[in-house]
Regions:
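Residues forming the flavin
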Residues: 1-239
Length: 239
């Protein structure tokens, strides 16, 4: 898996780092990349790194989250609240402010986000006196090797783990077992199909998440309702 990094102005400045970099330097090298920190992403990783940074002596000025509600486990969110770290939901990072010679970060601009996570003009807020922006906005699958494998071997190349989707270790193990049966089929080796179905069911069940019901869903405007819609059929019962 590779980090997902949202696009914002000056996102390539020294001082803008992903949680993986921040944690590695802090936990393995015992080094802080900054004393005053802004965390982007109110999920488990954002909560955990903010908590660890505070324990290491840093000052996390805030955690900003573009969605209207917090992510992650409530126990993790409550832990950073007890440390006095504010969690600002409905805000997106607009800009990292560089120092005079563009060698570090000295501030950031955040703004309220609309339902497409775009900044709303006129709602900008300035956050000053920070040296580090800690990006904790999740991961995306790293499927480059899988793509190359399929180009060479076709459908006889099977993906597992984070090459397929981001999930927990249990899901990766189950997908690995499922792929093993698929390899046996490619080799024309007999196996118990009931075992394959059982593993497949476990794997699919491990992907299921409760359906989130939106109190105020984003609906199309009347003008959009009067225009044609593209209808896509779902071929599979899972994604």
């Amino acid at each position: 898996a590779v980090p997902f990094i949202p696009v914002f102005e000056n996102d390539d400045l020294p001082g803008v780092y992903t949680a993986a970099v921040v944690q590695k330097l802090m936990n393995l090298e015992h080094a802080l990349l900054g004393k005053n920190i802004l965390t982007v992403g109110a999920g488990n990783i954002g909560y955990l790194t903010s908590y660890q940074l505070t324990q290491a002596g840093a000052n996390v000025v805030a955690i900003v989250e573009a969605q209207k509600s917090e992510g992650g486990f409530p126990v993790q969110a409550n832990r950073v609240r007890r440390l006095g770290i504010p969690i600002l939901t409905g805000y997106t990072l607009v800009k990292a402010i560089p120092n005079d010679d563009y060698t570090a970060v000295k501030g950031a601009v955040i703004a309220q986000a609309d339902n497409k996570f775009k900044p709303i003009s006129g709602t900008e807020k300035l956050i000053e006196n920070i040296e580090l922006i800690n990006i904790c906005t999740g991961l995306i699958p790293d499927d480059q090797l899988l793509i190359l494998g399929k180009e060479v071997f076709g459908n006889k190349c099977h993906g597992v783990g984070d090459a397929i989707r981001i999930g927990e270790g249990t899901s990766a193990v189950l997908r690995g077992k499922q792929a093993a049966f698929e390899v046996l089929a490619d080799l024309d080796i007999r196996y118990d199909y009931d075992d394959y179905l059982a593993i497949s069911k476990e794997y699919i069940d491990s992907q299921q998440h409760p359906i989130r019901v939106l109190d105020n869903p984003a609906k199309p405007t009347e003008a959009r309702k009067n225009k044609p819609f593209v209808i896509i059929d779902c071929l599979y019962g899972f994604a």
